């Protein structure tokens, strides 16, 4: 099993807007091999940070979901709402050991 963590630095003052978009978007993220997903906004650390975490059966399941979501018009429309509110981001992928 793997854990994928996507961290985004949001534009200043946009956390409230992003929160509504994320709540809507998590309902669209359904894929084979996906176990759970969570979204976090910062309490400490760099201001206006959004973290999206999800766990997958395997790297292959995650890669397939990326390809499938990229071809999904509903997901593309949701993503287009989110990206103007984001300054930058990065992804970390971990092997789950317990």
Describe the role of every protein-language-model region.
Residues 5, 49-51, 88:
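Broad gene-expression machinery/nucleic-acid interaction feature
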Residues 9, 53-55:
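Short hydrophobic/aromatic beta-strand micro-patches
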Residues 40-42:
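N-terminal secretory/targeting leader peptides
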Residues 9-20:
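Short, surface-exposed ligand-recognition loops at beta-strand->loop->(often short) alpha-helix junctions
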Residues 44-48:
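Short acidic/glycine-enriched loop/turn segments that link adjacent beta-strands
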Residues 2-8:
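Active-site-flanking beta-strand signature of metal-NTP-handling nucleotidyl enzymes
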């Amino acid at each position: 099993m793997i854990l994928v963590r996507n961290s985004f630095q949001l534009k200043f003052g946009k956390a409230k807007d992003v929160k509504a978009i994320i709540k809507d978007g998590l309902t669209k993220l359904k894929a084979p091999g996906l176990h759970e997903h969570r979204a976090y906004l910062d309490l400490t650390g760099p201001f206006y940070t959004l973290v999206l975490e999800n766990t997958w059966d395997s790297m292959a399941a995650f890669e397939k979901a990326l390809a499938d979501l990229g071809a999904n018009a509903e997901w593309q429309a949701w993503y287009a709402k989110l990206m103007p509110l984001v300054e930058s981001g990065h992804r970390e992928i971990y092997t789950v050991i317990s």
